């Protein structure tokens, strides 16, 4: 039987995981072609921070070696950017660095174009020394810059920004984190935990400017950044500026294909685009029920469902994901999930030990745990997340909740 043709646009974690799942379910159904704009096989983007910090090498974060593609009879076009998709003839066209064009036909198309970093629209954003932090090339630029320059400014006090700041500090740079909000990681932490995080990072040598609005990146006269100027007129020196102020789904290709996009490529519960059932979208580029996810767990869940449908099983349904954040920033453990800010109709149980560097906050509503924010001691994070996911009634264990999972539970 002649095989169908599957083309994957985007050689990242979400798309390749979907292909792995598909190969498990239907190893001989498709001839698979993969296009990736980076000149690398699939790697673990989450581990770019340890690479920046000098704790791991690029080779150590590769998830799928060149050999894996060959062993699974996958045609990989690495370093080739897809520029056009003809939906009528079902042809994908990609451009190589030398200008040559590669074409591939498809019966099914999987779009995993990911996201683009948001760049603040301020004067000086195009100066040399101003970068985002998304891939191996960005990481290598930071490592090289740290060898010859002293002052770094990271704009953005979220997870990515703090990891970039920590890595640059370990590379010997003097690092200032600039954040527009009143506390760090406001999407994952409340003000108390955010304050504890700031103090811990200051103790390690990072500097912070909070409630700071960037007005301009200042030119040194030779086309390179030399300082960041703020709305209040003050400046801080910068040989390197790293923008870590969020991401936007990369929908440019999908829009050129006239696929419906709103906060991402709009998909159904089967991860098929609402415009064209032959085309699937998975990962940061996809908008499911109005949400584009930027964390790995939901992307892998999506990949599993898409693979199920591509394998003609057709029983998987993606229902959305409850997400949690569990992370380590310079040895500091953090965990948050659900509605950890609380509010009307909720009850909060709080344990705070600022001297020991431990803070726990649990939010309860209608006898159910609806949110958790942990700092310094995250041992029970997985248990709390399970209670959240399953919507368990916690009335009978309310008194013990703060002390962790009961034995025999």
Could you describe each region identified by the protein language model?
Residues 2-5, 24, 285-382:
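Mid-to-C-terminal Rossmann-like scaffold of FAD/NAD(P)H-dependent oxidoreductases
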Residues 10-14, 134-135, 155-158:
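Glycine-rich Rossmann-fold phosphate-binding loop(s) that bind the pyrophosphate
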Residues 126-149, 219-229, 234-308:
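FAD-site-proximal beta/loop scaffold in flavoenzymes
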Residues 142, 394-409:
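Cysteine/selenocysteine-centered motifs that mediate thiol-based redox chemistry or coordinate metal-sulfur cofactors
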């Amino acid at each position: 039987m002649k095989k169908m043709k599957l083309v994957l646009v985007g050689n990242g974690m979400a798309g390749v995981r979907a292909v792995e799942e598909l190969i498990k379910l239907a190893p001989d159904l498709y001839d698979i072609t993969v296009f990736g704009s980076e000149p690398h096989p699939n790697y673990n983007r989450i581990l770019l921070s340890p690479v920046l910090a000098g704790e791991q090498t690029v080779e150590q974060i590769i998830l799928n070696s060149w050999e894996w593609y060959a062993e699974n009879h996958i045609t990989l076009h690495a370093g080739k950017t897809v520029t056009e998709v003809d939906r009528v003839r079902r042809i994908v066209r990609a451009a190589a660095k030398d200008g040559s064009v590669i074409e591939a036909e498809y019966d099914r198309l999987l779009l995993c174009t990911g996201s683009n970093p948001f760049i603040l629209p301020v004067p000086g954003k195009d100066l040399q020394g101003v970068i985002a932090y998304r891939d191996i090339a960005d990481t290598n630029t930071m490592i090289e810059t740290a060898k010859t320059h002293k002052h770094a400014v990271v704009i953005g006090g979220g997870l990515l920004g703090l990891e970039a700041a920590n890595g640059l500090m370990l590379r010997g740079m003097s690092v200032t984190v600039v954040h527009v909000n009143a506390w760090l990681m406001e999407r994952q932490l409340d003000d108390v935990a955010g304050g504890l995080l700031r103090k811990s990072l200051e103790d390690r040598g990072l500097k912070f400017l909070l409630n700071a609005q960037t007005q301009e990146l200042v030119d040194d006269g030779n086309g390179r950044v030399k300082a960041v100027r703020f709305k209040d007129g003050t400046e801080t020196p910068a040989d390197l500026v790293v923008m870590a102020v969020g991401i936007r789904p990369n929908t440019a290709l999908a829009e050129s294909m006239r696929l419906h996009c709103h906060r991402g490529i709009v998909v159904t519960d089967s991860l098929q685009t609402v415009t064209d059932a032959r085309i699937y979208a998975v990962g940061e580029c996809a908008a499911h029920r109005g949400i584009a996810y930027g964390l790995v767990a939901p992307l892998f869940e999506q990949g599993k469902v898409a693979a199920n449908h591509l394998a003609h099983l057709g029983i998987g349904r993606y229902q959305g994901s409850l997400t949690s954040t569990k992370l380590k920033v310079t040895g500091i453990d953090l965990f948050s999930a659900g509605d950890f800010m609380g509010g009307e109709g909720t009850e909060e149980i709080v344990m705070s030990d600022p001297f020991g560097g431990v803070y726990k906050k649990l939010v309860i509503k209608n006898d159910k745990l609806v949110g958790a924010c942990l700092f310094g001691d995250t041992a029970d994070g997985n248990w709390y997340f399970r209670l959240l996911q399953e919507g368990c009634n916690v009335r009978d264990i309310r008194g013990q909740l703060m002390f962790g999972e009961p034995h025999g539970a």
